Design a protein with these regions (language model features):
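Receiver (REC) domain active-site loop signature in two-component systems and cognate sites
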Residues: 63
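C-terminal output helix
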Residues: 116-129, 133, 137-138
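Alpha4 helix (beta4-alpha4-beta5 surface) of REC/receiver domains from two-component response regulators
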Residues: 25, 70, 84, 95-110, ...
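Two-component/phosphorelay signaling modules centered on CheY-like receiver
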Residues: 18-37
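CheY-like receiver
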Residues: 130-175
Length: 175
């Protein structure tokens, strides 16, 4: 396993299904996470953000009230958000490519299909911690860079202003 101190990681788990929430919490505890905060829905999670200041959020897509998708959009764009850069791992049973795109376009860092496995949770958690994506601000989007592939063969002009890309450290804080 990696050298990450999971005991120092503060994780917010948001799911309106108590059984799924407990499963994710149990998996995180098995990794050594001790600072786990649970929220029963998007509104509850939003109310906790100022006091909790999580390093990572694991969030269900389909919840009553504020959905996971609505939560991520609000997290990334609302002027009252305490940390728009916090990494978000979206959990869902909807794995069609359109759902993956919607989560990505809302600002989710990673996508995790239900039912979750220990290996899949670890993989996504390591992805957001060890390989954080730079954040991009565009006219209609703010969130982690959506590019997954880097091409050494691209010869055209860089279309992004480097001043608009923000690097994060291993716990999602601005560098």
């Amino acid at each position: 396993m990696s050298g990450i101190r999971f005991d120092r990681l503060r994780v917010l788990v948001v799911d309106d299904n108590q059984h799924m929430r407990k499963l994710v919490v149990t998996i995180l505890q098995a990794f050594g996470c001790t600072q786990i905060i649970e929220a029963v829905d998007g509104e509850h999670a939003w109310s906790l953000l100022p006091d909790v200041n999580p390093d990572v959020i694991l969030l269900d897509w389909q919840m009553s009230g504020m959905t996971g998708l609505e939560f991520v959009k609000k997290l990334r764009t609302d002027e009252k958000t305490p940390n728009p850069f916090v990494p978000v791992i979206m959990l869902t049973g909807h794995t069609h490519v359109d759902h993956v795109r919607m989560a990505r376009d809302a600002g989710a860092n990673e996508f995790l299909a239900k039912p979750v496995s220990v290996k899949a949770v670890m993989s996504r958690l390591l992805a957001v911690i060890e390989h954080p994506r730079p954040f991009v601000r565009a006219n209609t989007y703010f969130g982690p860079c959506r590019r997954r592939r880097v091409s050494d063969e691209y010869k055209g002009p860089e279309r992004r202003n480097s001043d608009e890309i923000v690097a994060l450290d291993d716990l999602g804080q601005k560098k």
